[in-house]
């Protein structure tokens, strides 16, 4: 459980770094190019020696984003619960996608982890305000113990043509 919280915490700081640097992605993310694709890590991920990348753009055009929770620019969980957290996540997702000149229409799959499945309707109302049909494929699960006590975590896969 501690490793999962550390991984998600790193993603929080990655999101804070990305959201402030949409116009100059190379200034905030470290990129490693390999034959299979480009791997992006935040400064925090590198400092903490986390065993994962924050975002990967494969040579085949797939873009994998590590899970996002509803944090602000300082990496702290936004107050107010599911609604504000969800909007913060979509702001982060937009910034992540912008790093590769992508948008919500380029997302093909989402994994939603929610702390209370009874809030599913509330989440869906916000989700559908960001995505338009045809919607990405999606999986969901109830999850207890998300980093920082978050109500939601969202992980996405996009395609860059």
Spans of features found by a protein language model:
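Sec-dependent signal peptide recognition
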Residues: 2-10
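N-terminal presequence-like segments and the immediate start of the first folded domain
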Residues: 13-91, 95-105, 114-161
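Surface-exposed aromatic
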Residues: 108-110
